[in-house]
Amino acid sequence: MRRLVKLCLFLLFCASSIKVIAQTLPNKTLYVHVSAGLARSEDGLKFMVKESASQWTPKANLGIGYRFNKYLGIETHAATMLTSLKANGTLVLNNEKAEVTARHSNVMISPKFYLPLGDKSELFLRTGLGFLLSQSEINSPSNPDFKKSTSNIGYMVSLGYAHKLTEKIVFTLQFDFSDPYGSKDVWEGDLGLLNAGIKYSLNHKK
C-alpha cells in the first residue's frame, strides 16, 4: 500500500510542472459518475489447498460528486461485482474437496484532488473510507451450503485521468485499490480495479 501511495504522489508531483490552463468541469458542479471495468482479488484462501481459481470479475460503479474548485471535490460512490470469484481445492481441516465463491461490493465517501494538465485533461487522486461488503459461500460434502456475509470498514485509493468530451461529459480512466474484503475463514483479499467511465454534469449549463 505504501508503494501505491508513493507512486500516486510521485505522478502528481511530476505533473505539477505542466502549465495549468483549465479543468474538465467548472467549479460548483454536481455530477454523476458511471464506470465499469475488471477487478482482481487476492484469494486469501489459507484454509484450502487451492487447485484452481478465477480471481477476475467485471465490476460496475455508480457515484455522485461535487466539484468545489479547480483542485478539490468530494464523491460518494458504490460498486459491485457482476459475477462471482471462484476457487476449487481441498480443505485443510478435513481433506474434503470444496468450491468457494465470493462477491464483493462497497459504499464509499471520498475527497477528490484534481491536477489540471491542459484545457481538456487532468489527473485526479481519490482517497476514500467506507464499507467493504462481501458474500462468500463454501460448498463441500459435509457442509454443502455454508454462507457468510461480512462488512468491514476500510479505505480505497484511486488514481485516474479525465478528459473533457463536451461541456457536460467527461471520460475517465482510473485504477482503484482497496483494503481487504471478507474474512480469513472464507475469502479474504485486497481488490484492484481498472475501469473506464463517464462523468455527466447535472447543473452546468453552457
Language-model regions, residue ranges each:
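A charged, solvent-exposed segment within the mature domains of Sec-exported extracytoplasmic proteins
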Residues: 128, 132-176
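Predominantly the C-terminal beta-signal and adjacent terminal strand-loop region
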Residues: 77, 81-88, 104, 155-206
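Start-of-domain marker
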Residues: 33-35, 43-57
